[in-house]
Amino acid sequence: MSTAITAKIISQAGKANPPSLVALYGGTLGERKASITEIENDLKAVGLNVIEFNARRYLSESDLCLPLVQQIVTELKGNAGNNGTTSDLVNRINESAPVILSTSLSSENRVEMIHQFDSAMKKLAAISIQKKPLVITLQGIERAVSGSFIKISEFISNYIN
């Protein structure tokens, strides 16, 4: 990571060592967006994979994890390459993701689908992230349903960390 990016993150977070999670507060929405865009461009310039997730686009969703999963899978798929293994993993993720968010499944079926999703997502992330590290930026999360940030943070730490 370039020192300019690190300096920006340190100044935004106000800490000596930047945490794995940095939140931008203060300033106008435009100023925060400009800072995030600048940081994203710097991250891309040094060869990192950047996913820009704007929660405002999905405010009608009760759970933001599914749109985030779709964005992450699209990015990881492109980074991992299009081969048989990648396609199989993506198909398993796409098949199981909406199902595990459903509340109408029996617990046995739900456990099976969670295992399928968990296994496929971790394998796809491992293949992709070895080739090109991944950074996810979240915007507009303050307007989402209460608890959305915690769910997204847990999801990212479970599969991408």
Feature locations, PLM:
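Glycine-/small-residue-rich active-site loops that bind phosphorylated ligands and cofactors
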Residues: 31, 59-60, 143-144
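N-terminal pre-Walker A segment at the start of P-loop NTPase domains
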Residues: 1-13
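Short, glycine/acidic-rich beta->alpha junctions
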Residues: 5, 16, 148-152
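P-loop (Walker A) phosphate-binding loop of NTP-binding proteins
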Residues: 27-28
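Conserved Walker B catalytic segment
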Residues: 109-161
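P-loop NTPase nucleotide-binding core
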Residues: 20-22, 34-131
